[in-house]
Amino acid sequence: MVRVTEVVHTKKHHKHKKIPKLISSRNLFKAVEKNNIAGTKFLLEHGISPNATHPNDSIEYKSLHWIISKNGELIEIEVGIDTPLHIAANNGYTTVVKILLENGAFINARDSFGFTPLHSAIISSYKLSSIKLLLEYGTSLTLEIIDGYYRGKTPVGLLKKIGSKKDKKVVALRALLELEKLYRNKELDKIVKKTYIKEPHIKDFIKWKIEAEIPKFIKSNISFLNKHIKKNYLLLISF
């Protein structure tokens, strides 16, 4: 007769035997792709690098950047290997982005075309939640794409290339990136003192809001920005 304790022991032993097979960079990519927060944490806690690159024999986890002609025809596909952070940022999985960054993911990791996670977040329908978080963690605003159709484009340059000037989300995102750049370069005081900003109350309000919390301000004041940026900040956002 087999005792219950022996069955439990056998199951536990069998379970532990399977765990090493689950701990792999391939499964980290799968967890990130599915926005599996618990799975991502588990794999990172068990030693999988947040900077792993997926084996290049699987196109499923490669970055796909496509160029579509005016008539909607697909005319070119570019393929480069992503990191988990590229995938999380590209999909707007903010919690997973944060987990990866907190566990040592390289915030400015480059795929084979030179896309950083910020570039990936921008090109994928302007994932604002990912962009905000990447900015908070200090992602570069000056790194350029090194190959392909978008070669030489910084994050702002990429947004100019793919975004419509009439899209309020694009206008707000341009403002966010440009203002963040000015803020980092400590040039904000110079900008708000320019004479082309005529209304003192707007000048003070803008400065206070930007210094306090740029991303939240941009997200909650899209209509304000759309109106006043074009009127008062043509030197800052040059369409």
Curated annotation (Swiss-Prot):
InterPro entries: Ankyrin_rpt, Ankyrin_rpt-contain_sf. SUPFAM superfamilies: Ankyrin repeat (SSF48403). ANK repeats lie at residues 23-52, 80-109, 113-143. Keywords: ANK repeat, Repeat. Transmembrane segments: none annotated. It comes from the Bacteria. Pfam families: Ank_2. This is Putative ankyrin repeat protein RBE_0489.
